[in-house]
Every structure is written in C-alpha cells, then in structure tokens.
C-alpha cells in the first residue's frame, strides 16, 4: 500500500509500516529531562544509572513523530489524534547514539462516530538486537478531512 486514504482504513488490518531509523543524542536527552522536570526531580546523581541510557518515557514520546514520519497515510483525506495506550512495555535498554528501528502494525480498525479507532502495535528495536526495546499498543482516532472544520463552523 503506497498512500493509505481514509476509505482504506477498514481493510488495513495487518498492514505493517517500517519507520526510518533514528538515534537519540545528548541534546535530546537533556531537552527531555528539562521539559519533563526530570532534571529537577533527580538532582542527586544516581551512580549506578548509566548516563547514556535513554529514558523509557522519552522513547514513548517519540511514538507520534516517528509514526508520522513512517506513515503512508494521506493527510489530504484524513487527520488523526491520540486516543490512548492499552499497553506499554520497556523490554530492553536503548543508549544514546544507538539506531532505533520502528515498526507499526495495524491490529484493529473500529468505527467510532464519523471516523475510526485504529489500534497499532508500535515496536522500537535497537538495530542489531533481537529483543525489542519498547512495545506499545496505541489507539488513534481517524476522521475524514473536513470533519473538524465543519464542527468549528457549527460552534
């Protein structure tokens, strides 16, 4: 499937998308610590905590951007938003500079209002490793383009 349209969603169960590899560096780790106040909450250094270890919640926060960059979804026919997570597991460590590979598999598509709830299994794996670093089951809502605009006009 090259570009998935809104009308393609009901038949997309089982579709797998591979994202481009990415790596997180010191700049991203520092920015995340500052934005989430981890730099304030953990003032005392924990000597046994490796400085190069990527925080699990930083990986989780990458889901949306990495999925958007990997997605063949047509932004001209639909738009989506976060609906929630059913399950998240941090299985293996990720360290600064390691290349992370992302995979997204559509597990379910269910009608919801004028759109669909879409469940994707999102897997991040460090390149060269067998075990995934993180697996998250993530629900999104997808609506046909124009739905939000029409709702705003009625408000």
Predicted regions located by residue number:
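Hot-dog-fold acyl-thioester-processing enzymes
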Residues: 1-82, 147-155
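Short alpha-helix capping/helix-loop boundary micro-motifs
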Residues: 85-90
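HotDog/MaoC-like acyl-thioester-processing domains
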Residues: 1-10, 93-155
